[in-house]
Amino acid sequence: SIDEALLLGHRIVVIENGLVKAQYQVPETAGERNLLDDWFISLKRDIINNLNITE
């Protein structure tokens, strides 16, 4: 899931037809990541748009 990738990953890659469509760097943060933070919400929306799916 996108949320799991945001919580656990440091880099998220969107692949379409075997090609890299988009890459995202998730900064290493001290403490826990907050998916309700504006930065994470914006990143999730961008990933969803690149996947051509609706929220």
Where is each model-derived feature located?
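A short, surface-exposed alpha-helical micro-motif characterized by mixed small hydrophobic
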Residues: 5-7
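Conserved beta-strand-loop-alpha-helix hinge in the C-terminal portion
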Residues: 14-48
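Short secondary-structure subsegments characteristic of cysteine-rich extracellular domains
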Residues: 49, 53-55
